Design a protein with these regions (language model features):
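Bacterial N-terminal signal peptides
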Residues: 10-19
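Carbohydrate-binding surfaces of carbohydrate-active enzymes
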Residues: 28, 172, 183-198, 205-213, ...
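Extended carbohydrate-recognition surfaces in non-catalytic/accessory domains of CAZymes
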Residues: 30, 38-50, 56-58, 66, ...
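Extended substrate-binding grooves/exosites of carbohydrate-active enzymes
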Residues: 36-38, 44-56, 61-86, 93-97, ...
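Short hydrophobic beta-strand segments in globular cytosolic domains
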Residues: 71, 691-692
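Hydrophobic faces of well-ordered beta-strands that scaffold small-molecule active sites
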Residues: 74-76, 103-105, 141-145, 210-214, ...
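Aromatic-lined substrate-binding rim segments of carbohydrate-active enzymes
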Residues: 88-156, 160, 229-234
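Aromatic-lined ligand-binding clefts that engage carbohydrates, nucleic acids, or primary amines
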Residues: 665-687, 719-720
Length: 772
């Protein structure tokens, strides 16, 4: 139990004070909460939903159910074929340690049958092995089996022989698929191959696969998805949950209960055909009833809306693509703030989300194709370009396994969802009538409540990407419950800090003791085996942490006649004894500690992230070619106004450097090569082979070295950079655009370094891992 590492004091002891000042009379912001209506069920056409141990997955109109209890799944997207097989286990463990409990992954058809009839399931394309590791590390899996995927892959994952086939007419618009028996016969063969890979790894077998997504972003007739479901089951893929994206709107609705729609929302839209700040994305920072982000696929989608209002009362609000990052396209060089993703996720949860899927949670790289490169590009008729190799996505875990700041922000949220998500899933969202639906309105505070009519959580989002948000002074809330009770808090008005986002509980039963409200964010809980309960909270920065308990539920009611104000610190949690004798302990962590808190360990002590001590070593550069000649960035199509990415031949005019790595690098620690540069596009080649590329967005170009060892230690490492042209229309984040010279060009290397953990720390980490 946590208390094995903590000294406790009573509510009148150390580490806290009692608020003695009277509450200031301020008119609270009021929300009337109704009693949730009955859930609907019985119409869902689930597949085999029991595992050999009898654990059952089911669903109703409000939430998923696991083992008879409400279940709030937390899923992270990670594409197995975009990552080396040798690093899968390490990556999946990082995901698990970040609070992820399930992995979603695409099966890109052209990664496995680039040439018709030639199947490739080896190495990084071995789906069976990937699922085995998911099972071994304790992660569920949702497999997005296509046949069309998107994922910024070449032709959305369609092999060229499918995309360019003359056997059937091309679909009339984006979002449709070929309607031809030979096409479906090819899909049937694909599904048979995938089914063989999954054999023995489905939920019914005791395996990790609990769900399958059919196609992606499909907007045609429902009969197509019904055909895919039939083909999947015939191929042996009988799983509890069959899903689809809830966008765009289909020609006709799916038969009820056959397929569950999953939704999405992003912090940026790198696909937009614009070089201005995206206006539509700002709506994702509002609490709202609408589930669909209509900006998704707006580059090509001509069908407005999605299965939203029609399905809102019949399906739970689940997401497949809550954006935890964003790719960098050639014409939109986004650079995300960690809070962009964290507050976006909070907005979705505060709007009623009952299961969250982060896209992408782990970045990757496009594999080498046998015939072509495998990225989305304008050469193939797409409306934007992405990098040839890199699919880093600015994800919480980067392309080379780098841990980024939003990994910690999302982990803090995920810890809460693991321990309390089941309670939250039962609670629908209630939105104040005063909530603005206009994201340009920054004067009205954005808040919502999720409640079961008895208790709940109040969500506040005072953050919006690229929009400074003001503080709100003299704020109190009043939640009026259907039983006549009210939760009015805080006791005294507070200032909601600028650019902040958080949630607070009210009328919460904690081990028989009712927490009337707290101005702190719950993180996780632990039972001590003797009937006691410890609950860990995170402070809301610049807001006093105030806890108010119902005296009638305490053994000594006089102990908390006034609000309890707690100061952050793990050494002295407060301890309360309920009227029934059970013990409740409250621990409050500082902002910093809450972001470094890890899942409880085998010793049941709170464990915090030890941020590694890093060492930087400069890399020797030798200039080989000093060209940097401007290229023609315009499309050959005069109607296409956006710039197009450089082709291989354009790099004949690049400036070129030869890099010499420092000696003695410990490749086991995965040292990172960091290239600080300004320019348009940078490419790194090893013995003439492209190993990574980067569209400049103001961030450092990073390459993990371990996967290229030992070749990279002795081979020729070459860096190519093309100049960025000031006249080229490209979107940059504020402050990210480089400085241009008198000729309107930007090309500069500031420094190149290798960053690695110090060896002593690596040895300590290895010893600790063996001890655990």
């Amino acid at each position: 139990m946590f208390t094995s590492a903590l000294k406790t004091v009573s509510a009148t002891g150390l580490g806290l004070t009692m608020a003695l000042t009277p509450a200031v009379e301020v008119e609270p912001r009021v929300l009337v909460v109704g009693m949730p209506g009955p859930v609907a069920s019985g119409y869902f056409k689930l597949g085999a939903n029991k595992d050999p141990a009898g654990r059952e997955i089911s669903v109703n109109s409000r939430h998923l159910i696991l083992d008879g209890r409400p279940w709030f799944p937390v899923i992270g997207e990670f594409h197995f074929s975009r990552h080396p097989q040798s690093e899968w286990r390490e990556s999946l463990i990082k995901m698990r340690d970040g609070g992820i409990r399930g992995v979603s992954t695409y099966v890109f058809w052209n990664h496995h049958e680039e040439i018709e009839g030639e199947w490739d399931w080896e190495g990084r394309k071995n789906l069976r092995c990937f699922l085995e590791i998911c099972r071994d590390v304790g992660l569920m899996a949702v497999v997005r089996i296509g046949p069309w995927c998107n994922g910024e892959a070449r032709y959305g994952g369609f092999p060229d022989w499918i995309e360019k086939s003359q056997k059937w007419p091309a679909p009339k618009r984006w979002g449709l698929r070929p309607e031809h028996p030979e096409y479906l016969a090819s899909v049937q063969r694909l599904y048979h191959q995938i089914g063989q890979q999954m054999q023995g790894h489905l939920w019914k077998d005791g395996g990790p696969v609990v769900g399958i997504q059919l196609d992606n972003e499909y907007s045609g007739p429902s009969k197509y998805l019904m055909s895919l479901k039939k083909l999947a089951i015939e191929a042996g893929m009988d799983v509890p949950l069959f899903t689809k994206t809830g966008w765009p709107r289909m020609v006709d609705p799916m038969p009820e209960g056959e397929v569950i729609p999953f939704y999405g929302a992003y912090a940026e839209a790198a696909w937009e055909g614009s070089t201005e700040v995206s206006a539509d994305i700002a709506y994702n920072y509002l609490f709202r009833a609408q589930r669909i982000d209509e900006s998704i696929a707006s580059d090509v989608n001509t069908v407005s809306g999605g299965e939203d209002s029609e399905s809102r009362d019949r399906y739970p609000f689940l997401t497949a693509e809550t954006g935890s990052g964003m790719f960098v396209s050639y014409h939109r060089r986004s650079r995300l703030d960690p809070r962009d993703s964290a507050s976006l996720a909070l907005c979705q949860i505060g709007s009623g989300c009952a299961g969250i899927g982060y896209y992408m949670y782990h970045g990757g790289e496009n594999p080498d194709g046998k015939l072509t490169t495998l990225q989305k590009s304008t050469i193939n008729g797409d409306v934007f370009d992405i990098a040839v190799k890199s699919y880093d996505f600015q994800a919480p875990i980067g392309q080379f396994g780098q841990i980024r700041p939003h990994y910690h922000w999302l982990r803090r949220l995920n810890l809460f969802l693991e321990d309390f998500g089941g309670d939250l899933a039962r609670m629908p969202a209630f939105l104040p009538a005063s909530n603005s639906v206009n994201p340009t309105n920054t004067s009205d505070l954005r808040w919502s409540v999720r409640s079961d009519g008895h208790a709940g959580f109040l969500f506040v989002n005072n953050y919006q990407r690229l929009q400074p948000m003001p503080e709100h002074r003299q704020v109190r809330f009043e939640v009026r419950l259907p039983n006549g009770m009210r939760a009015t808090f805080p006791e005294s008005p507070v200032t909601i800090p600028a650019d902040s986002f958080f949630f607070w509980p009210f009328h919460w039963d904690l081990n028989g003791i009712r927490l009337l409200h707290a101005t702190a964010q719950p993180l996780l809980k632990e039972e001590d085996g003797e009937g006691g309960l410890t609950v860990v909270f995170a402070e809301t920065p610049r807001v006093t942490a105030e806890f108010v308990f119902d005296p009638a539920t305490l053994k000594n009611p006089s102990e908390t006649e006034k609000p309890v104000v707690i100061k952050p610190g793990i050494s002295q949690p407060i301890e309360l004894i309920g009227a029934d004798g059970r013990v409740l302990r409250i621990v409050l962590l500082s902002e910093k500690d809450s972001l470094s808190l890890k899942r409880k360990t085998k010793t049941s002590k709170l464990e915090f992230e030890e941020f590694p001590r890093m060492r930087s070593t400069p890399v020797t550069l030798e200039l080989v070619e000093n060209l940097g000649t401007p290229r023609n960035w315009r499309s050959s199509n005069p109607e296409f106004q956006l710039p197009v990415a450089p082709a291989d031949w354009d790099f004949q005019e690049a400036s070129v450097w030869r890099l010499r790595l420092p000696e003695g690098l410990d490749m086991k620690g995965n040292p990172i090569l960091r290239i600080h540069y300004q320019g348009d596009v940078a490419r790194l080649l090893l013995n003439g082979r492209l190993i990574n590329d980067n569209f400049y967005n103001g961030e450092v170009f990073e390459i993990g070295l371990r996967r290229f060892a030992p070749e990279i230690l002795t081979g020729e490492l070459t860096l190519q950079i093309l100049p960025l042209q000031e006249a080229m229309p490209v979107y940059f984040e504020p402050g990210a655009k480089p400085r241009f010279n008198a000729e309107g060009l930007a090309l500069k290397i500031e420094r190149v370094e290798v960053v690695e953990r110090v060896r002593e720390q690596l040895a300590n980490l290895a010893a600790k891992k063996m001890a655990d």
